[in-house]
Amino acid sequence: MLYCLIYNLNSSSGRKSQFINRVLSKLKENNSVDYFETKTTNQAKEIFRNFNQKKYDRLIIAGGDGSVSFAINELIKNDFNFKDDFAIGYIPAGTANLLQAELSMNKKVDDIVNVLISNNYKSSNLVKINERYFFLMAGIGWDAKIVHSINSKIKKILGKIIFGIKGFQYFLFMNNKKLKVTFDGQFYQADWILSSNTKYYAGHHKINKTNIFEDKLVTYIFKDLTRISLLYSIF
């Protein structure tokens, strides 16, 4: 089989780069692999613009949850011809790595490679918002502000700690603006909306019983988000 492995260098530190190289070396032992490293969005987009030409059997993304979501959207945007046996593999190299938790993946090189070369794959539920797709979760309001405020370079250095720092900052200085949303024909004014296609939130914190392989999207609408109501919802 012909593999395409794309590693988002912005998603991880040097230690994870060593891990990616170990996986790559193991994968190359019995397979053909085209390997790409990207530092910019434009570099990644260029790869996907030419993706149809190579007739890849597998796409492997080494990066975070956002890297996988980006890849899916670029494949669709560029009208990729999905073969019946085409599959996307994943090497966790991001910060939160919700997908790693969702798939109950371990961090052993041999185990990851065995999954990547296997034919044991399943279709994931894909959700569309406007012109973009997501497969884990999408939010607008409180947590979206936190994610948007985080500098990618600082996140690469501090890892998950930066989410805690920014989360605490936005918790202390909560300043919500009402959002207008229509859901199932009913109108709401809300402070935070979270649509989840996964059981996990913010790492390994379980919020649902669903998973990415089930058509059971769960949407939370926080109409009056306060510090107390947020703590109650989390705990």
Label the predicted regions:
Residues 1-62, 73, 111:
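ATP/NTP phosphate-donor binding region
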Residues 8-10, 93, 222-224:
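Cofactor-binding loop segments of dinucleotide-utilizing enzymes, especially the Rossmann-like FAD-
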Residues 139, 143, 194-206:
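Glycine-rich phosphate/pyrophosphate-binding beta-alpha loops
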